[in-house]
């Protein structure tokens, strides 16, 4: 992995702002496979192989947080063979990649419900999270068995169990009960395969995010495409509800 963030090839005074937090809806694995006459699980395997170079691209660009939408609470409706295959693939990826990501300073976090997943997969996820918890180079959140509405409902349940009074509840308190507690909200949400919807992904956290869509299927999405999305993000103006525009993100690349 590169050790210094890029500056998108421009002089210092023109450098594009870099998003702190990029979230990606990794869509199109099945369609990528079908277009090649392959089984859907072959597309999911190709998609997982694409995660590593995108992580490297985030490090090279100086992005601090990457959140990957890997398996939604709605994906349980898919055929059992596909769901079980996804569990197997995730377990293999954890086994193959965790140690190297740890050596490179990447922190792994899981967002979503661990309960309901196979016990062996739960154990692997917990191991990866605990091993890498002190790393600071890049935080990678894997949203697996995750749904935005489910997250909000679960947060409300936890607040009720904790006995919070109505006057104690504000946005900051509510956010502290979400899976993303302690993390800044996504600045940029990327979706592959040409779709233009959130699909129940980070629906609280995405309130002021910028969106970027590409017709490329996830296995086709590369570092150059990530850089293109970040460059376009840097040229946008964000107002966060006010009249004052902020160009791109909230910080410039070093």
List PLM regions with ranges.
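Flexible, compositionally biased loop and terminal segments
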Residues: 1-254
């Amino acid at each position: 992995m590169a050790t210094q963030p890029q500056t998108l090839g421009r002089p210092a005074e023109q450098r594009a702002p870099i998003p702190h937090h990029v979230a990606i809806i990794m869509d199109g694995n099945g369609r990528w496979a079908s277009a090649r006459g392959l089984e859907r699980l072959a597309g999911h395997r190709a998609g997982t192989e694409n995660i590593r170079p995108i992580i490297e691209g985030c490090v090279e660009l100086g992005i601090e947080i990457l959140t990957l939408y890997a398996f939604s609470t709605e994906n349980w409706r898919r055929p059992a063979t596909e769901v079980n295959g996804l569990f197997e693939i995730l377990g293999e990826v954890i086994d193959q990649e965790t140690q190297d990501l740890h050596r490179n300073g990447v922190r792994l976090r899981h967002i979503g419900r661990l309960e309901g997943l196979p016990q062996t997969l739960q154990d692997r996820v917990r191991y990866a999270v605990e091993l890498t918890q002190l790393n600071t180079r890049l935080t990678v959140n894997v949203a697996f068995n995750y749904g935005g509405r489910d997250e909000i409902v679960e947060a409300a349940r936890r607040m009720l169990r904790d006995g919070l009074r109505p006057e104690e509840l504000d946005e900051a308190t509510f956010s502290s009960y979400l899976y993303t507690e302690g993390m800044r909200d996504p600045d940029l949400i990327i979706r592959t395969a040409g779709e233009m919807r959130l699909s129940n992904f980070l629906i609280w956290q995405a309130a002021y995010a910028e969106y970027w869509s590409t017709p490329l299927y996830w296995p086709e999405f590369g570092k150059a495409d990530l850089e293109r999305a970040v460059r376009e993000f840097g040229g946008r103006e964000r107002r966060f509800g006010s009249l004052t525009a902020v160009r791109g993100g909230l910080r410039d690349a070093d």
